Amino acid sequence: MPHGTLEVVLVSAKGLEDADFLNNMDPYVQLTCRTQDQKSNVAEGMGTTPEWNETFIFTVSEGTTELKAKIFDKDVGTEDDAVGEATIPLEPVFVEGSIPPTAYNVVKDEEYKGEIWVALSFKPSENRSRGMDEESYGGWKNSEASY
């Protein structure tokens, strides 16, 4: 399995279902890669076609297969509304090294709620040896001692 750095460029979303009945939505995205969570800025007043153009970095390790992108509408005084979620498979970027901006379906309760545009790139870790750094498994090393 790949170990390395995943760069995620959160570009935009289109055709989102409006979760705010009185005003334009203020959408933001929570990105989750295994146990790592990162949030985008709030696209204030951008409604159903927000643009973020933000870059996020995740550390990829054994068993990482997908990235989740959950879209929320920021509300003041009440809990933020969940707009929907996209599941982005990572195998293509592990093979290709980079994926240009691509649309992924946003769904909620198995219903289509729009699309999110994301670009991906992956840089494998260097000097990986069975998942351990050389120094962590007691490899022989020249002594710095002088006599």
UniProtKB/Swiss-Prot annotation:
By its UniProt entry, which PANTHER family does this protein fall under? Answer: 16 KDA PHLOEM PROTEIN 2, C2 DOMAIN-CONTAINING
Cofactor(s) in the UniProt record = Ca(2+)
InterPro entries attached here?
C2_dom, C2_domain_sf
Q: Which Pfam families match?
A: C2
Known role: Binds to both sense and antisense RNA. Can also bind sheared DNA and dodecamer DNA with a low affinity. Interacts with mesophyll plasmodesmata to mediate its own cell-to-cell transport and potentiate RNA trafficking. May play a role in plant defense signaling.
Name of the coding gene? PP16-2
Q: Which SMART domains match?
A: C2 (SM00239)
A molecular function annotated in GO for this UniProt entry is: RNA binding
Q: From which source organism is this entry?
A: Arabidopsis thaliana (Mouse-ear cress)
Which residues hold Ca(2+) 1?
20, 26, 73, 75
Task: Give UniProt keywords alphabetically.
Answer: Calcium, Metal-binding, Plant defense, RNA-binding, Transport
Biological process terms from the Gene Ontology for this record are: defense response
The protein, known as: 16 kDa phloem protein 2
Which parts of this chain are annotated as the region Disordered?
126-147
Q: Which residues form the C2 domain?
A: 1-103
Residues at which Ca(2+) 2 binds = 20, 73, 75, 81
